Amino acid sequence: MNQGKIITVSGPLVVASGMQEANIQDICRVGHLGLVGEIIEMRRDQASIQVYEETSGIGPGEPVVTTGCPLSVELGPGLISEMFDGIQRPLDRFQKATDSDFLIRGVAIPSLDRKAKWAFIPKLSVGQEVVAGDILGTVQETAVIEHRIMVPYKVSGTLVAIHAGDFTVTDTVYEIKKEDGSIYQGSLMQTWPVRQSRPVAQKLIPVEPLVTGQRVIDTFFPVTKGGAAAVPGPFGAGKTVVQHQIAKFANVDIVIYVGCGERGNEMTDVLNEFPELIDPNTGQSIMERTVLIANTSNMPVAAREASIYTGITIAEYFRDMGYSVAIMADSTSRWAEALREMSGRLQEMPGDEGYPAYLGSRIAEYYERAGRVRTLGSQEREGTITAIGAVSPPGGDISEPVTQNTLRIVKVFWGLDAPLAQRRHFPAINWLTSYSLYQDDVGSYIDRKQQSNWSNKVTRAMAILQREASLEEIVRLVGLDSLSEQDRLTMAVARQIREDYLQQNAFDSVDTFTSFPKQEAMLTNILTFNEEASKALSLGAYFNEIMEGTAQVRDRIARSKFIPEENLEQIKGLTQKVTKEIHHVLAKGGI
């Protein structure tokens, strides 16, 4: 422990002297109030400290005490359904302890409740050899999540004691005799430094798709479990709603939602909506699998920088248990702005648009912690982290540094488009500019699992949309009537795909989520219409005849998005009806 004194205060940056025995990334208690800070730069005996609480009223001469520990999170039962701030302070217990709706400075509250008792059920017995990552036992944390208590990193040996029963997170639950003869006493809780990724046995290639229930994503721009995706877009394009939809309906075990520097009302929406929503996979409330980290725009700027790391470390902990985890960061641009502010106060040489030169490496550091892995331990298990980051480029300009550095790392780009949002086409993901480098892997995975021709259908649908884009300029110049019959059909089918398939109402109880079988049935109907109508045109039918003769079935295709999942056969039955009506048009020989 080292004690120094403050010599300079500049917003969230405090410089202290007499810190020659301190280390970089040490946590400090700053001033008489004991504010939480982290050393980010050392020069001789002077330490630059970024303070995670409001520094007004702090002055030169006040003491700074180091703890000798890096910024760490507590990992154990009690994380699920909890809401933390950027440095893992539990906001509900913080409010009860301080009787204030605002963050009172200098208050230290443990992240995990020290009084709550958890029923521990051992899975191993005394005398067994254990290594780091082995599951010792379980705690039923919520109705959905079984919390698996693991042997901490760098601990291995013989299990000499393990107890069943109700324990707090600090009670000794098991004892391991290490190779050197010392006894390690373990509890339900472990700590981990947030800036250090948790070790794994092996990194694997992600192949299984993350089903989000959003048709434009699952069909055209899928992300895998263990993948990384970016959602850039201007203000009002729907980034937060896309993130909320994935957090609600993604087929993962755990969701970590990090509200980083965004509006407080958005976190309020999450708190109001999530407890009422039922997870379609488990039938329980979505909050039963969610961890919230709220670091809104009016909270100290330095804590934004920590909140992303806090979230990904908690995600890694659940991944190590063998769960699939999705982490949403909304928004990484606010995190980058916090880096820029601290870099400016440190008087570092600025890079593009004032961001620090190390912006790219910090963004890469975060996204590289996602992935599909084989975890540590003698028991074979896999876990995944899917990282989805919203990016808020000023004015929607995706050439700015945060977006460009993000796109260099992630494999999925869901580009939100202001013109689409203004036309009230939501989700406003532009199908011409977005991309997914997982498309081929996901397509072959689905074809193999479902025994269907899914990837071919997706390719055909995208070809129709791209053909429409090339025809639009001709239509604007000389009108729709100047097109050939086949091109007019292409324009009509493309409109069907856009309006009846890609458009999705997040606030409709049925349309908000579409399962994969329903997506396939809906897309098959539209493509069947295109195929049968093309055949009819080649046999001499007119475009107008086909459109008038199939008006009823096309209307039913348009309404199929509002048919509940349990009535899926109704949607599948439309395929035969499409063929029948077009054959009827041909049989009549004109209308």
From Swiss-Prot:
Q: Which Pfam families match?
A: ATP-synt_ab (PF00006), ATP-synt_ab_N (PF02874), ATP-synt_ab_Xtn (PF16886), ATP-synt_VA_C (PF22919)
Q: Which GO terms describe its biological process?
A: proton motive force-driven plasma membrane ATP synthesis
Family per record: Belongs to the ATPase alpha/beta chains family.
Keyword list (alphabetical) reads: ATP synthesis, ATP-binding, Hydrogen ion transport, Ion transport, Nucleotide-binding, Translocase, Transport
| Presence of the UniProt keyword Heme in the record | no
Supply the HAMAP family for this chain.
Answer: ATP_synth_A_arch (MF_00309)
Which residues are listed for ATP binding in this entry? G233, P234, F235, G236, A237, G238, K239, T240
Enzyme class, broadest EC rank? translocase
Which positions carry the signal peptide feature in this UniProt record?
none
Write down the species: Streptococcus pyogenes serotype M28 (strain MGAS6180)
Any Gene Ontology CC annotation? proton-transporting ATP synthase complex
Q: Which GO terms describe its molecular function?
A: ATP binding; proton-transporting ATP synthase activity, rotational mechanism; proton-transporting ATPase activity, rotational mechanism
* Name of this protein: V-type ATP synthase alpha chain
Name the domain of life this protein comes from. Answer: Bacteria
